[in-house]
Amino acid sequence: MTGGGKSGGKASSGKNAQSRSSKAGLAFPVGRVHRLLRKGNYAQRVGAGAPVYLAAVLEYLAAEILELAGNAARDNKKTRIIPRHLQLAIRNDEELNKLLGHVTIAQGGVLPNIHQNLLPKKTGTKPGKNASQEL
């Protein structure tokens, strides 16, 4: 009787399988990003750190956009994020607007903007200095 362990004849190191996403502390799938980088013919070879870095960047961008869109939804007294909230979040943020400047968001609408020349002119007379109040 050789190898009298409880492993059932299978040599195991005692560690459970851990995904690369959980090792990196990410929610985005590192394995899927790696597969897409390989299948996309971007390069002949893909390093081990490249999909981790790319997944982290994508997760950060998604979190940033969703944070701003959630704030826009809350400002409009809504509990559900709609494309209009995404549009407002992206267009009101300078860096995201620069990154996604040529992106069209379906059902996003436009930013409310009225040109200064079209606004009614304010009269500059102050009360107490009218000519009708002479003695």
Curated annotation (Swiss-Prot):
Gene3D superfamilies linked: Histone, subunit A
Modifications the protein undergoes after translation, according to the UniProt entry: Phosphorylated to form H2AS128ph (gamma-H2A) in response to DNA double-strand breaks (DSBs) generated by exogenous genotoxic agents and by stalled replication forks. Phosphorylation is dependent on the DNA damage checkpoint kinases MEC1/ATR and TEL1/ATM, spreads on either side of a detected DSB site and may mark the surrounding chromatin for recruitment of proteins required for DNA damage signaling and repair. Gamma-H2A is removed from the DNA prior to the strand invasion-primer extension step of the repair process and subsequently dephosphorylated.
Modified residues (N6-acetyllysine): K6, K10
Residues modified to N5-methylglutamine: Q107
Primary localization: nucleus
Residues recorded with modification Phosphoserine: S132
CDD domains: HFD_H2A
GO biological process terms on file: DNA repair
Swiss-Prot/TrEMBL keywords: Acetylation, Chromosome, DNA damage, DNA repair, DNA-binding, Methylation, Nucleosome core, Nucleus, Phosphoprotein
Entry's localization field: Nucleus; Chromosome
Pfam families: Histone (PF00125), Histone_H2A_C (PF16211)
Gene Ontology terms, MF aspect: DNA binding; protein heterodimerization activity; structural constituent of chromatin
Motif [ST]-Q motif per UniProt: ranges: 132-133
GO cellular component term, pick one: nucleus
Spans annotated as Disordered: 1-24
Residue(s) at site: Not ubiquitinated: K121
Record flagged with keyword Acetylation: yes
Family: Belongs to the histone H2A family.
Quaternary context: The nucleosome is a histone octamer containing two molecules each of H2A, H2B, H3 and H4 assembled in one H3-H4 heterotetramer and two H2A-H2B heterodimers. The octamer wraps approximately 147 bp of DNA.
Stated role: Core component of nucleosome which plays a central role in DNA double strand break (DSB) repair. Nucleosomes wrap and compact DNA into chromatin, limiting DNA accessibility to the cellular machineries which require DNA as a template. Histones thereby play a central role in transcription regulation, DNA repair, DNA replication and chromosomal stability. DNA accessibility is regulated via a complex set of post-translational modifications of histones, also called histone code, and nucleosome remodeling.
PANTHER family per the UniProt record, alphabetical: HISTONE H2A (PTHR23430)
Note: In contrast to vertebrates and insects, its C-terminus is not monoubiquitinated.
Record remark: domains: The [ST]-Q motif constitutes a recognition sequence for kinases from the PI3/PI4-kinase family.
Protein known as: Histone H2A
Organism encoding this protein: Podospora anserina
